[in-house]
Amino acid sequence: MAGVWQHPFVNVFKHLRLEEWKKSSKEGDVTSVMDKTLKCTVYRIRGSIPAGNYIQLPKTSSQSLGLTGRYLYILFKPLPGKHFVVHIDVSAEDGQTVRISFSNLFKEFKSTATWLQFPFVCGAIKGSVYDSTAQGARQGMVGPAPSGSRWTCLLLDVQYILSLYLSRRYSHLRSAKLCSNLLVRNLMTSDLLFNPEVNFMEARHAKTLPDGISPMPREMSFPVPKGEKWHDLYDFIMFPSDSSKLPYDSIQKGQSMVTAPGAPMSRSPARERPRSVTISKPVQDRVSLIQQITTPRPMPHRSLLRVESVPERPVSVSARAEEARDLEDRSRGVEQDGGVHVYAHKTNKLSIHRHKSDSEQVICTKVDRPETLSVPPECKKLLPDPIFNLRRIIGFGGCTECFALWTHTGCSVVYPCHAIIVVLEVKTGEQRFLLGHTDKVSALAFNGSCTLLASAQTGSLSMVRLWHFQKGSCLAMFKTHVHSVSYLSFSHSGTVLCGVGKDGHGKTMVVVWNTSQASRSGEVAVLAKAHTDIDIQTMKIAFFDDTRMVSCGKDNVRLWRVRGGTLRSCPVNLGEYHMLEFSDLAFEAGHRPEKEAEDRTLYVSSRSGHILEIDYKNVVLRNVRRVQPGQQQHSERRDKQTFSSGPGIAINSLSVSATFCATGTEDGYLRLWPLDFSGVFLEAEHEGPVSCVAISPEGLRVLSCTSSGELGVLDVPSRGYNTLMRSHTDTLLSFSCHPTHPQLVTVSSDNTIRIWDTGTLQQLYDFTAEEETPCAVTFHPVRQAFACGFSSGTIRFFDITATALQAEHKQHRGAITGLLFSPDGSLMYSCCSLGSVALYSIGHKEQHVLRVLGNVVCKDSERGPMALSLSSDGRLLAFVGPTEYTVTVMDARSLDELLRVDVSILDLDSTTLDCALGLAFSPLKPHHLLVSTSGNKILWLDPKTGRLTREVTQVHKQCCSSLAVSMDTRYMLTAGDRLLKVWDQRQPGTVRPQVFIGHSEAVQQVDFSPDQQSVISAGDAVFIWDFLAAPDPEFTKTDCVPALPFALHSSAALDPSSEHRRDSTFISSGMPRGTAPRPCISSPPRLDISPVQGMDHPDLFSESDDGQEEEGNRDEQERTLVPDTRDNLVESDEQSSVVIIECQPNRAKLLTGSKSNSSSLREGMVKSTHEPPRPDSYTHFHTRFKASCLAKGMCHPPEGQEMLTLRALIGYNGNGRANMAWNPDTGFFSYTCGCVIVVEDLHSGSQRHWLGHPEEISTLALTNDALVLASASGSGDGSSLCQIRIWDTQDGSCMKILTHHRTEVQAMSYSRDDRLFVSIGDYRDGNLALWSTKGYELLATSRLFQPVHAVTFNPAHFDDFASAGPGAVSFWRIETQGTDTQIKVYRVAVPEEVGTAAELTSITYNSTSLLYSGCSTGQVCVWDCQTHRCFLTWEADQGEIGILLCRGNRLLTGSNTRRIRLWCVAAVQELREKGSGASSTSVLMEHEMTLDGAIVSATFDDALEMGIVGTTAGTLWYINWVENTSIRLISGHRNKVMDLAVAHGESHCATCGEDGSLRIWSLQSCELLLQFQVLNQSCLCLAWSPQPKSGPSTEDQRIAAGYSDGTIRIFSVSKTEMEMKIHPHPCAVTSIAYSTSGDVLLTGGKDGQMAITSPRTGMTIRVLSDHKGSPITTIECTGRKLTGLPTDGELWLAASTDRRVSIWASDWSKDKCELLDWLSFPAPTSQKDLDVSVPTLAAFCPWQPGTVVYSGFGVEKEILFYSLIQKQVLLRIPLSHFATSLTLSPAASLIAVGSNERLLRLIDTSAGTKQDFAAYDDGVHLCRVSPSGNLLLTASYNQVLVWDIQNS
């Protein structure tokens, strides 16, 4: 509000009272004069020295004007024939002061981090010689003001200037300094755009002005005589301007502000490039540095895309949609689309301001330039922002392959990839990016310490950027004065930079810059520059002298020196070698104290194979050598490579270290020579010519680049070669992702097909077509194969695993423009540029053509490679054709035409015909067809009727080259103009798209990855972006994605007989299926020809034979009708606010009768077939999704003969609500964990466990005397009602089981006298039940028409209780007459100040019948229960309040912001009498604590001084307000427990979880002792180090853990720290084990690779790939040696998901590891038995040495005992269910087996007995027996149960 006084404008001279000179100052010749033109007093400033004649506003530089207006208006007139200077100092939001100066003294634009200097072009009288000259010239007009200079109104958009040129946010105007020579009338700041042509009088008569334009205030306007025009007398300049006289970086006169009545003002007009350079249309539209390079076109334009920031540490490229605090919205008129501005910014993200809307209205104007329309301010931004994050780039080079640099540590290499600079870590392959260049990077250079990096981009407007390399920030950017920079060289100190390039006439130019101030102020000055006729290939600054340089090129080697601002050179006398073409040079490395710094050898290489040694000090040619002839290469001659005098091999690059020299030659060899060049001691052959070599700083590795796009490192000591990056050498045309493997296939104009590993970016395979270009490619959805279409019309089918051509089809004659597989892979579709389309049958052994149609597809090769589109169900095929104006939809099974749509006539208002360019089906039904058109539109067509359902306009400036839709159809991707855009399709027209840059060429294709976690775009390179949008919960909940094809799960993919069973079911996205899969109907859909749209007439339905679609439509209709149905149910009882529900005694007996009566009652219940909408409240209980189910039968142990007893349970269910009970008087304390109630003694820590619930317990209720506990859970199967169990707290017996609610119980409460008990069902159940605690008979029920979140009894009136729900509180009254019970309810809405959308989520009474209710908005309402009115509200939190407790004059609140607060509410009773006039200031907060999760349960003593609080993090806290302390009582995992292990000595155990935590617990107290947390990773497996031979010692105990990023971390328990981090795997580590000696770690990965690693050194000793392709599930070692085996050593085994077990014998001290045996187990052939959740389990049998115990997914449910000695199965133990976990006791012949049916089975193999134990609400996925065999630990999701084994 501080800036309100500045609205609408501030007259600065009047504000400072300039005439008094008290708040301002003047210096020199400053006088006030009367101006005849303006007829008012103005100030004249004149003098030959501007710095000595000026007006300063305010008086001193330490003061600030503090004016926040966006626009600065300066009314001035330059004095004829003179120069003037104006300085404007502004402050940015980060506190940085920036000076903006403009003057006709400046010759060119200059920019530093703190100073912008703009040349000013003075206007002249119309028709004068100056005006004529200005119109004809394009540059050189900066200079003294002409004699006819006029009064000028200069409008500076300070906010935009600061944002555009320096990427800073404008804060306020600090000062202004007006220097001679000029006349100035005034300065004004405002947030409004004023039109100087119009004054208030004219505006009042005109009544209307263009949107966003205001008339000039009276005191600022210029007088205009009658009959004259304002622009004939004065100049109006708006900067940034729309002028075309000079380049963008000068201030000059442009067009008038308003070009036509009613036409809005252009905000940021287009700018043209100098016309001396001819450029193509794509180049014109490039995203330019500080520059929009677009030319006006007579067509509507969209809003300006403005880049807000370029990352200084470029980890991601993002499109941030911030409104930028008035940058886009406040008082802004309209914007002309001029492209995207890119510039340096000190942030970590690249942000772009996007469209204000998806579509814009078209307005006809009378001007000859495009007009941009205003955008609605209500447009929202797309969230998350940014939605993309650039993660990886596959590519190298682009403009040049001659630059790749080492960092000074040798850990990373830096190389260009088109317009992006990539920093690649050699060991890990991780990439980070330096972003900012808008064209291809042509040169790179480091200073000596690698702290500064210089980079140049190609093009006629070449730019050089200086980077702070560690931060990734751009320190400076500047023009190079050359057409294109070809080479850069930094001095060792980093203070001098040299560049070589060509000027506009093609002449070589050398420029030397002073960069010493770049790090401080960002200023770079030209030291010297020179033109020369000689050719320069390489130029380097001598590392020992910043003023000396050496260059080489064709016919010359020259020495250069900078002295006195001039650059001079002299040639080296080369004698007979002066005609050679020299390619590279290098100085002798190292420094010898006895020699001068310049006394060293200069090595120069040539294209003829010569290497010259030049004495640099004496400028003398010392020696000449030559590489051996090309025909005597290493492949043909094995003798030593030497120099000779014969014809040589062209040397492209040279690098010299202190001990050897490296050369890269045209024959593809990297050769290493000693410095005497006696012979090659190491060489590496490449696929193409080596273009660059660089020796690492330590001299042990050599970096090499090839012109074929390969970047690699040669390790000299080990003679190993590591390929870092491969790349296509031409434009990418198409790509395809494999649905199930992390593989990407790409095709390019370089005639190659390449397959990449998307995890490591390594090239796996490549195929080369010599005489034809691959045009389109697609992966087979099931097999490891792909199809590729070529320019000749041939389609080839490649088998990847066999790396062979499997089939070839030659049905087409034109280039292939479209190629697709059906979702099940049984069919293939193709089309070509000559108009034909073909359908193929794809079998495992044979492929044949089913049908070919000619002249049906549009004959245009430009539509490839995405000319075809197939619906996700495989039923509809669409393409553009037979003309470019039509789109055809066919039956994908038969190619029968179903529909043809003419897209050219859909827009009736358009004067041009629209052509269809590309298309795509939306994945979800009704499978809308998206069509991109030449009119920059995306059309959404109904695939049945062809009707236009939606339209998105102004998608891109040029054509949309590719589009894709996410699996949930919420997001749409489009590519065009080198940009990517992301659109939210759920709210079209109201959410701005996000825009992403980075590509330097047109984007050929963009698509989502199969798992929807990434987006891939291809053009100049392959960009892999992280897609950060959260999955749509509605999409994951509904069955929108059918099941995975059977062939993906097992060997059925190889079975030809299974082909006929396949359908076109789409491949799963990896998200869990919400409902059971429906059968897929293979018959084609009938075309609905009804002209009526279903959405317009919901009572009309079209016929469909697709049951799934029909059911899906019915789901949507019934979901919307559920609230109305519930309303009718309630309204039918009584049409008033009081509902009376009567309940007869016999009805109560019926409800509490036998189970058969309950079932018969259940059949008669009125229930909706579809669930109501889920409440948007964390307070409401939602049971966790479980894929497991309850077992049908159990083997219960005989009483007293149980082999297991439950000792302890680790964890608390943070998913429950009010599921903890504590009575401070009796000390009774209980909580729930899964389906178990834990009763714990707070003094001793001992636990009792009450079992019986079949499902997760949702809530608890304790009577006031703490003698009875009620608990509620689901039923466990859909056929029965959920359970409410009544427990006796004294002996733990279950007294009663109540069944009434259908789904879950949300809340329960006992009355104050414990006589009544009320239970509330969840949102699906919608029932309230009132029970009598005497026998627990049902007294009354009520149907609730809205969900209820909380219920509680009034302590003052035993017959009253209240409930809270959405928007209202309900007061209930119980009335009893004899045996009849009635309940009445009065429902009161929340006050208006709380909001109608607020939900009441918690309630509590005080002792005087005041009811406190907490809201989802964080407010607390206080209600008078007698009058049923709310008399007080206050904001108690920023989040939803889920817990309320009131004791006396204190109130406790707990919310989902993780905070609990204690309030003093003593004054509330007094405020009760004041009614609505009560003030919330009388409520005071006394204490506040922040815990580790949202608050879900709380119980306190009567004084609210101490209590226990439960959170969603699975923690129970002891809270003491008096001492202000919180102590963790109970801890547990919030997410799934991934692994557990017991330490030697059995005093501790360790668990790890999905959240990346590794926790160590005490097995005595079950307390959490230690926790190691790794962010953003999952900890998947762990292992304790083995017990040392000296005996147990806690000091030596370590834990090794494997993580999802492929790393292993070793933690010391005693030191409580991480000792080592190892990265042996490229993907997740799924299994880990120590060898029995502890010398090595054995780990298995998700890719099936196994690594043997030393835990002492961290080195990976060996990698085993025998299980490659199937994740490792088990690794186990045994120290027992067997006499019957052929080999000695330690035995260990590994099992993988493909039902294979390998057994190994190893002697690690001898580096010996041999495969001993290989076991493979069959799987069922029936598809209905397929269960991919069953793991492969294997273990060594402790009591039978040499025996392996196996269980897995097989033909039978069983455990197998396999003898390694006898090579046969010894024993089979049948199981009732497949095992999901398995462990064997080392002390007895016991096997513990967990299953997905929530059972733990203990099998005594010696006695042949088995016992089942049920204490789980989910599958038992982990079982571990302690080393002594006394304890058994099991895990079910996040619960850990500790059992005692009765070995007797």
Swiss-Prot record:
Residues 257-278, 316-336, 1053-1133, 1151-1178 are annotated as: Disordered. GO terms for biological process: centriole elongation; cilium assembly. It is found in: Cytoplasm, Cytoskeleton, Microtubule organizing center, Centrosome, Centriole; Cytoplasm, Cytoskeleton, Microtubule organizing center, Centrosome, Centriolar satellite. Residues 320-335, 1114-1129, 1164-1178 have a biased composition (Basic and acidic residues). Residues 1-222 are annotated as: Binds with microtubules. Residues 1102-1113 have a biased composition (Acidic residues). WD repeats lie at residues 436-479, 481-523, 530-570, 644-683, 685-724, 727-766, 769-808, 811-850, 955-993, 998-1035, 1252-1297, 1300-1341, 1343-1382, 1395-1433, 1435-1473, 1532-1571, 1574-1621, 1624-1663, 1670-1714, 1774-1813, 1815-1848. InterPro entries: Beta-prop_EML_1st, Beta-prop_WDR90_POC16_2nd, CFA20_dom, Quinoprotein_ADH-like_sf, WD40/YVTN_repeat-like_dom_sf, WD40_repeat_dom_sf, WD40_rpt, WD_repeat_EMAP. Keywords: Cilium biogenesis/degradation, Cytoplasm, Cytoskeleton, Microtubule, Repeat, WD repeat. GO terms for cellular component: centriolar satellite; centriole; cytoplasm; microtubule. Signal peptide: none annotated. GO terms for molecular function: microtubule binding. Belongs to the WD repeat WDR90/POC16 family. Microtubule-binding protein that plays a crucial role in ensuring inner core protein localization within the centriole core, as well as in maintaining the microtubule wall integrity and the overall centriole roundness and stability. Required for efficient primary cilium formation. This is WD repeat-containing protein 90. It comes from Xenopus tropicalis (Western clawed frog).
